[in-house]
Amino acid sequence: MKTIYTLLIALIFTLNVNAQTETKVTSNGQNITVTIQNIKNDKGSVLLGLHTEDTFMKGPGIKNLKSKIENGQVTVTFTNVEAGNYAIMVMHDENDNNRMDFENGMPLESYGMSNNPMSYGPPQYQDAKFEVNDKDLSFNIRF
């Protein structure tokens, strides 16, 4: 029984040390500031998702933000973003239902992505991808 308690204490200590190490690493990440200026009205909110290739167009991002619109514009910041490749997707959720609305397969609400690609089909990760290194980044995304 003493052996089991000793192993449990050692395991908890190990997990605690790992958790502290991970927190320390993520607190050294970069900030990504996103500005959207051409929002057609102040109804609803803007939803923003920071995505990896694995999450892009498959659900929520690895970091997600929601912002109220003031005077047709929004500025938000993703904080503590670790180095790597990402893409940002944004949408104007006019009816605040937290999802994109469609009619006949076409989006009813405005949307945009990092790098502002002009595409005639579903958004592609490669078109919106950017790299985070050792500097903060800023993006102006258009709907």
Spans of features found by a protein language model:
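Bacterial Sec-dependent N-terminal signal peptides
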Residues: M1-V25
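Primarily secretory-pathway and cell-envelope proteins
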Residues: A19-H51, F102-F143
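Short loop/turn positions at the edges of beta-strands in beta-sheet-rich folds
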Residues: K40, N80-E82, E94
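Short amphipathic beta-strand segments in non-cytosolic proteins
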Residues: G49-L65
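Short proline/glycine- and polar residue-rich coil/turn motifs
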Residues: S67-G72, E131-N133
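A glycine-anchored, Pro-Gly-centered beta-turn/N-cap motif
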Residues: G72, T77, E82-N85
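A short tyrosine-centered beta-strand micro-motif
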Residues: Y86-V90
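Acidic, glycine-anchored loop motifs typical of Ca2+
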Residues: E94-D101
